[in-house]
Amino acid sequence: MAAHSIFTTTSTTNSFLYPISSSSSSPNINSSFLGVSLNVNAKFGQSLTLYAVTTPKPLTVFAATKKAVAVLKGNSNVEGVVTLSQDDDGPTTVNVRITGLAPGLHGFHLHEYGDTTNGCMSTGAHFNPNKLTHGAPGDEIRHAGDLGNIVANADGVAEVTLVDNQIPLTGPNSVVGRALVVHELEDDLGKGGHELSLTTGNAGGRLACGVVGLTPI
């Protein structure tokens, strides 16, 4: 049986063994591994280890910030614009400006559907993926869509910035395509003792609503 020398090539996933025949005292091996050309002079009786090197691929960088907007309208003169932004997997910042409100507190919620074919009534109930009862934004037990109250000044304008970690713009519980709704009355945050306290916060009618849609960064 003829004697052989062995050389190997190693990558992150495979090792290859190739015999060097004894018929040549100094065989010249020309080959290519993973797109890298090799030219190796091997002497009989020696063992060679060759390592293939891959060319780095360009990285694809995705924008870490997501932004969205909702334009609120209704059957009255109440209207507004709400912008939402989220960095990476952090909380979502919500900037609210609504006009035409009666001065005072108004419940402000994210509802489960982005359907406004029947006005704000067709937006469904509060967004509640965890099937909990209604509460305040800071409560452990709350709907994800429970954003508390906004306050309108004497001119009927409510301007506020909210930060919440249960209304992401991506992922299985993304709020994109759902609706923001401003209500007629104050939200009792689930603590008012009314029969509707643990479902709607007894916040009354729906004055204006808008579907959350993604916007350019």
Swiss-Prot record:
It comes from Solanum lycopersicum. It comes from the Eukaryota. Binds 1 copper ion per subunit. Residues 1-63 form a transit peptide. GO terms for biological process: removal of superoxide radicals. This is Superoxide dismutase [Cu-Zn], chloroplastic. The gene is SODCP.2. Its main location: plastid. It is found in: Plastid, Chloroplast.
